[in-house]
Curated annotation (Swiss-Prot):
It comes from the Eukaryota. Residues 1-18 form the signal peptide. InterPro entries: Conotoxin (IPR004214). Keywords: Disulfide bond, Knottin, Neurotoxin, Secreted, Signal, Toxin. Belongs to the conotoxin O2 superfamily. It is found in: Secreted. Pfam families: Conotoxin. One of its GO terms (molecular function) is toxin activity. This is Conotoxin VnMEKL-0111. GO terms for cellular component: extracellular region. The presence of a 'disulfide through disulfide knot' structurally defines this protein as a knottin. Residues 19-45 form a propeptide. Expressed by the venom duct.
Length: 76
């Protein structure tokens, strides 16, 4: 009985770890897409700010995300 409970606890912990790791990978991919789009747009337009309203995330530094409510992302 104890062995069965131990296996169940281990399975739950492994599933939780897999979910957390998957969310972290998705967040990292979104961050890289944002940084790539910001860099490419800044190079082609020659401007300091770029309109990327769909890329608001925790990696953005305020003032851009707070002042422009994710309409503009400033080149830092």
């Amino acid at each position: 009985m104890k062995l069965t409970i131990l296996f169940l606890v281990a399975a739950v912990l492994m599933s939780t770890q897999a979910l957390i790791q998957h969310d972290g990978e998705k967040s990292q991919k979104a961050k890289m897409k944002f940084l790539t789009a910001r860099t490419l747009s800044a190079k082609t337009r020659g401007v300091d700010c770029v309109g990327l309203s769909s890329y608001c995330g925790p990696w953005n530094n305020p003032p851009c995300c707070s002042w422009y409510t994710c309409d503009y992302y400033c080149k830092f």
